Amino acid sequence: MRAVFIQGAEEHPAAFCYQVNGSCPRTVHTLGIQLVIYLACAAGMLIIVLGNVFVAFAVSYFKALHTPTNFLLLSLALADMFLGLLVLPLSTIRSVESCWFFGDFLCRLHTYLDTLFCLTSIFHLCFISIDRHCAICDPLLYPSKFTVRVALRYILAGWGVPAAYTSLFLYTDVVETRLSQWLEEMPCVGSCQLLLNKFWGWLNFPLFFVPCLIMISLYVKIFVVATRQAQQITTLSKSLAGAAKHERKAAKTLGIAVGIYLLCWLPFTIDTMVDSLLHFITPPLVFDIFIWFAYFNSACNPIIYVFSYQWFRKALKLTLSQKVFSPQTRTVDLYQE
């Protein structure tokens, strides 16, 4: 992901980030506007953190939810939760103040965590699509093919590959020594802008779009197979019909999650690629909106689960009613109608 950052003032630069030569201009908002933005961002962070904390708790606590698919959902929820806890607070200050006040070390760390958690979410959604494809298109072999051990391998890859990739570009001199012709110097003092160059923008394009293409192609096949299964469901036994219905509903729910992900991330991803060709002419305010639209995706998954998964609503009800503290609650069958 391109490291973002308000480089200058959008309308009336009333001040500078620092009282030094080469400082970035700063847009000073009225107190009312600042308060509204801070409250909106705080509400978004609260939804992201609390929603994903509950998903992680439910899957961890209730034994009925200890399935390969749900372990992937748990890992996805942790990535979104950490984004809300560790990245968005500083992103909020950067967006409101239009400057970065936390130094080079935190700038690099913030960019690392931002990129890590976002790429981890993308990889997990791709792996969940593979899981659903296997469950719908090859249901007889699915229990033996997609085991908990396989899910744990996917989780390890979903965290390990983004961590290694991001570390390579942010904490080594590989880019600077071998691709120095692509790099541009920091435009001004007070921006958190790392590796802002054409190579960085184009390299991130396939990292976002290849998983997207995989997810779309898998869900197209899932839709075709699920439609055919729905037409044949009357010939199945009651137990097999119920299992097939459950798998199709899970695939539909996760398909909605993938669709919302695409809507949230497409503006930012396309702009990152196109903007690198046009010498980064996107206004800072517009680019910041694209970034927050992408962040919004982390709040969507728990909301989708509330409206789509009966087990999620049951787990939420048990938790809020404090029945979760009963020893028998952990073994409740949340999938029972």
UniProtKB/Swiss-Prot annotation:
Domain of life of the source: Eukaryota
Gene Ontology biological-process annotations: adenylate cyclase-activating G protein-coupled receptor signaling pathway; cognition; G protein-coupled receptor signaling pathway; sensory perception of smell; signal transduction
GO cellular component, one term: plasma membrane
Cell cycle recorded as keyword: no
Main subcellular location of this protein, as a coarse class: membrane
SUPFAM superfamilies named in the record: Family A G protein-coupled receptor-like
Cystine connections: C24-C188, C99-C192
Extracellular side: 1-34, 92-109, 176-204, 275-284
Cytoplasmic side: 56-70, 131-154, 226-253, 308-337
Residues carrying covalently attached carbohydrate according to the record: N21
Keywords, sorted A to Z: Cell membrane, Disulfide bond, G-protein coupled receptor, Glycoprotein, Membrane, Receptor, Transducer, Transmembrane, Transmembrane helix
Tissues in which the UniProt entry reports expression: Expressed almost exclusively in skeletal muscle and selected areas of the brain, such amygdala, hippocampus, caudate nucleus, thalamus and hypothalamus. Weak expression is also find in substantia nigra.
Keyword Transmembrane helix applies: yes
Record-level Gene Ontology MF annotations: G protein-coupled receptor activity; trace-amine receptor activity; trimethylamine receptor activity
Compartment list: Cell membrane
Membrane disposition: Multi-pass membrane protein
SMART domains (alphabetical): 7TM_GPCR_Srsx (SM01381)
Pfam families reported in the protein's UniProt record: 7tm_1
Entries under Gene3D superfamilies matching the protein: Rhodopsin 7-helix transmembrane proteins
UniProt-listed InterPro entries: GPCR_Rhodpsn (IPR000276), GPCR_Rhodpsn_7TM (IPR017452), TAAR (IPR050569), TAAR_fam (IPR009132)
Its job: Olfactory receptor specific for trimethylamine, a trace amine. Also activated at lower level by dimethylethylamine. Trimethylamine is a bacterial metabolite found in some animal odors, and to humans it is a repulsive odor associated with bad breath and spoiled food. Trimethylamine-binding causes a conformation change that triggers signaling via G(s)-class of G alpha proteins (GNAL or GNAS).
Family to which the UniProt record says this protein belongs: Belongs to the G-protein coupled receptor 1 family.
Note: Polymorphic variants of this gene are not associated with specific anosmia for trimethylamine.
Protein name per the record: Trace amine-associated receptor 5
Organism field: Homo sapiens (Human)
Organism taxonomic ancestry: Eukaryota, Metazoa, Chordata, Craniata, Vertebrata
Gene expressing this chain: TAAR5
